[in-house]
Amino acid sequence: MSSPRPEPQADTQATIAANRARYEALKQAGDGVTPRHLPPPTARDGAPIAEECIRHKETVPGGWYWTKLIRRGEALRIVNTSATPGVSVFAWNAHDTSERYNSADTVKIQWTSELRKGRVLFSDMGRVLFSIIEDTCCAHDAIVGGSTPASNARAYGDASLRSTAENMLLAAGKHGFGRRDIAPVISFFSPVSIIDGRPQWRDGLVAPGDFVDLRAELDLLVAVSNCPHPLAPGSDYTPGPIECVVYRAPPSTADDICRTASAEAQRGFENNDLYLEA
């Protein structure tokens, strides 16, 4: 029989109390700054890209992956031409690949798992990697993660089908990285909500032609996996093609909604500024 856990020492209790007080103060500050309404979804026929601004365009077949260097000030548009249920993305700082996208911090720092136009994606060092500058469906998932051989076996009865876990490992290998360099991904076009403490898929929110635009706030190595989300409905593995477009984005301004949407986003951009000045 195990011994009862000892009570925390007084100094430990004081540290816990101080950390909780700081957490509550930060949350209150964030709640006070975050606007009541983020921008509405982008129209599917809106936000056209001028041809002269496009640096690269490529179609990624269903089940496959894509990786590219995206420079600060450029944006990646992912066009879901066939309403594939889920496209996963991961990113590394191109100049210090120990810094990478962090789903947990992205959700925690912004006090929300609703990542949509006006929000940002954080690294594990508190800097902003991507800003979501256009978004037609506003239905994305940073909680569940990408597909694996095990999730494919459960959903489709075949663990050999291509998965995001395997695609990310292949993409990482293109840059000399390994499994330890990959963390949980964000899945776009994946309408997942937490209901009664469990993640659930909400049907009918993704349509052909939906797109999301991610502006790079640092030079990034980016990996994209075109595999269905683990919770995607249906028993047939039929991911359709997507289109990845890298283009020169309009420059960010001081009142950019992604920069000003919350106190946490402002701090993230300030961290970027300090890093870029060094």
Segments the model singles out, each with a brief description of its role:
Residues 2-278:
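Acidic, Ser/Thr/Pro
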